[in-house]
Amino acid sequence: MRGLLKLIQCEMRKLKRKHFVSFVVFAALLFPIPFTALVLAGSVGNFTGFEAVFGLLVTMGMPIMLPAALGIIGAMLFFMERDHDTLKNLRVLPVSPLKIVTAKIAVLYILGLVFALATMLSSMAGGLIAGSELSNMGENIGIAVITALLYTTSILPVVIAIVGFNRSYIFSIILTFFYTMFDYMLAYGGMFATTDPVMKLLTNIMPAPIIYRWQASMFAEAG
């Protein structure tokens, strides 16, 4: 276990050199600005203040930002050794490939939780700007954390495909964004095409529609 923690720390140190990770966290903090503007304009129905900003972030912000960012970061993690020609160094280390892969995947989950924390903090700031109280904090923290874990899990098949194809970063970005947007559109478009058997099948297989239905049930219970 201690060896795995050291590997995770090593992978995190590698990512520190990449400015993209800092950009993702910064984007998570800035993302609530347009949603807060919508809330202040009264453009989100019966929802107001913190609940409205948080609901918009976890149902419309995280499904796009988190999988897209983690897919690209996953490609960075798995291609670093290839790009820097250090794969031969890993082969002489007394560490199994399974542990190295586990450490890289663990880093993705950690970053997903960091994104959830940034989303929570920024939605709290947006709620305070909108002049509302911070209600249902325990439930909302749970929703943010579980949503982050689910979307992190949902992007793992894409990361595996990227590693398997072993192509350039451009290919990784295109594949990640195509998957993310297709999944996102299914979550909302699928609601209006439930009679189509193909669409019904896809909305029961793809992660975003399933996560969205779970979020809707959680918000309904909280409300």
Placement of each model-derived feature along the sequence:
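Terminal transmembrane helical anchor/hairpin motif
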Residues: 41-53, 173, 177-223
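Aromatic- and glycine-rich beta-strand/loop motifs that create alpha-glucan
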Residues: 1-28
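Helix-capping/transition residues at the boundaries of transmembrane alpha-helices
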Residues: 14, 79, 90-92, 162-166
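Hydrophobic transmembrane alpha-helices of multi-pass small-molecule transporters
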Residues: 36, 94, 112, 181-185
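Secretory targeting signals
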Residues: 27, 31-70, 102-169
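Hydrophobic/aromatic positions within or immediately flanking transmembrane alpha-helices
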Residues: 25, 88, 101, 173-174
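Helix-loop-helix units of permease transmembrane domains in multi-pass membrane transporters
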Residues: 76-109
